[in-house]
Amino acid sequence: MTYSLRIADIPVSERPRERLISVGAKNLSNAELLAILLATGQGKGKLSAVGLGQHILNELSKYRRDPLDVLRDIHPQELTAIHGIGPAKATTILAAIELGKRAFQRRPTEKMVIDSPDTAAAILGHELMYQSQERFAVILLDVKNQLIALKVITIGTATETLVHPREIFREVVKQSATKLIIAHNHPTGSLVPSQDDILLTEQLLQGATYLAIPLLDHLILGNGNFQSLRQITDLWEKYPQED
């Protein structure tokens, strides 16, 4: 596909919208998907919509990160700084990104059963995934693993959040929970637990054992994925929980 051509000059079978209908969205390039949102082109060299979409990706690659990672958290002013992108195009892109985030973030419902790391991570996504600051949250459950509440305990900086076991167990007692799952996000996208993460988990497991309120897991969320500390550490063998 020639990026300098107008969409009208491109054979119908190669136009982004027509290709999406014929082969499906997942088979379109990132530039083609952006072109559908942009609707029209221009910018330097009077680029087509596809060309302008590719130009956006090229500009974002200057951040030395995957352009889609940059696009996920981009501000309107950063988009409009790209030649050929005005407020209308920028807001259309940002609205599409936000809609995509919401579509893949499952909101918790009352009495929902949380019986696996996958289910827990799914309901935590809305509060923890794709955040620019570290957040620490707790899922509070009843004896049947049914959801009582999901609470964000603290919001920190881009690299750390400070939380004390006392704050977590205060919420457990307040909500009359009998089990809990803790979680926090890493804005960098890394799912590797830090030494502080391990230490806090140990402290909470000890406290949970003492109070006879099982801590089922500690999840780390980032970049659309998650990690379960229960699955990758031996902490639950050292501090068994009656779950």
Swiss-Prot record:
GO MF annotation terms: metal ion binding; metallopeptidase activity
Residues annotated to bind Zn(2+): H184, H186, D197
Gene Ontology biological-process entries: proteolysis
Family matches, as Gene3D superfamilies: Cytidine Deaminase, domain 2
Keyword Hydrolase: yes
Keyword ATP-binding: no
Keyword set, alphabetical order: Hydrolase, Metal-binding, Metalloprotease, Protease, Zinc
Ranges where the MPN domain occurs: 113-235
Residue interval(s) of motif JAMM motif: 184-197
CDD domains assigned: MPN_DUF2466
Alphabetized Pfam families for the sequence: RadC (PF04002), UPF0758_N (PF20582)
InterPro entries, A to Z: MPN, RadC_JAB, UPF0758, UPF0758_N
Family: Belongs to the UPF0758 family.
Protein name, entry field: UPF0758 protein MAE_44350
